[in-house]
Amino acid sequence: MADKKVIFIAFAIEDVKQRDLLKGQSLNTKSPFEYIDMSVKEPYDKDWKDRVRTRIKRSDGVIALVSKNSLKSSGQKWEIQCAKEEGIKIRGIWAYSDDRTDLEGVYTKVWTWDNIKDFIDSL
């Protein structure tokens, strides 16, 4: 494999443990991607959106970890909208096996290595 793809992870802060699992996958030496984390625990500072947009523009794709928490996560919704505005491909991955929340405008699949790999290979 040539260069690793850069993947921006959009997630609700309540799903940080799931993000950590995905991060762990990206640290696997055979993983076809590296990830960018822009999570914030404090209210967004004034230039947060500019920094996020810059990082999304530098990314090959965005993986949105989708859960019931996504429905009320203004930061995650903004990141997804930003990716759409910048023409960056997005794939939703359900964060939990027992949660099939539908996030409008995001094509979402079950969290499997093959589904993640297929998305990354399509970039």
Question: For each predicted feature, which ranges?
Answer:
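C-terminal helix of von Willebrand factor
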Residues: K109-L123
